[in-house]
Design a protein with these regions (language model features):
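Beta-strand-rich interaction surfaces with strong enrichment in secreted/lumenal proteins
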Residues: 7, 49, 92-94
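HotDog/MaoC-like acyl-thioester-processing domains
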Residues: 27, 97-103, 107-145
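Catalytic strand-loop segment that frames the active site of acyl-thioester-processing enzymes
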Residues: 14-53
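Short loop/turn motifs at secondary-structure junctions and domain boundaries
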Residues: 13-14, 112
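Compact, glycine-rich, soluble single-domain proteins
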Residues: 44-71, 84
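Short Pro/Gly-enriched beta-strand edge/turn motifs at strand-loop
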Residues: 1-6, 101-104
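A residue-level detector for short acidic-glycine micro-motifs
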Residues: 21-24, 89, 94, 108-110
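Hydrophobic beta-strand-centered segment that forms part of the acyl-chain substrate-binding groove
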Residues: 66-103, 129-131, 136-139
């Protein structure tokens, strides 16, 4: 999936869209990537002399990958988006630096109606940087304006 396809599937937009492409997708698994350019604004403040990607952004990238996966499982024509309701067993393993690419792999482990239970892993240059388990509930979204 291209960036345009991703934007069709989920409501996230710049400056808070943390996916560039979807490498593979099935009914229960997605792999997506995001390149992190050195001039990314958040690196100016986290941290100015030793920039690293915040762990919460790694989690958000996994959440957004799951949103693309879940969008394929929801009825067509509905205005719904998954909202994170639970976050468990988060582990940060290695740092992510400017000019690197992160890869998010998310697996759907269980579904109960509009609630989805997932496991995620973020890797960078072959090393796991983050592992997490989380749940989302598909919620109706209203468009402003």
């Amino acid at each position: 999936m291209t960036l345009d396809d991703i934007k069709q599937a989920i409501p996230h937009r710049d400056p808070f869209l943390w996916l560039d492409e979807v490498v593979s997708i099935s009914d229960t698994r997605i792999v997506a990537r995001k390149h992190l350019p050195a001039d990314l604004d958040l690196f100016r403040g986290h941290y100015p002399h030793f920039p690293i990607l915040p762990g919460v952004i790694q989690c958000e990238a996994a959440f957004q990958a799951s949103a693309v996966l879940i969008s394929r499982l929801l009825p067509t024509g509905t205005e719904m988006a998954p909202v994170v309701t639970r976050l468990n067993n988060v582990q940060f393993r290695s740092m992510v630096r400017p000019n690197q690419t992160i890869e998010m792999e998310v697996e759907l482990t269980e579904r109960l109606q509009n609630t989805f239970y997932l496991k995620g892993k973020v890797t960078c240059e072959g090393k796991v940087s983050c592992r997490l388990e989380f749940a989302c509930t598909a919620t109706e979204i209203a468009k402003e304006g």
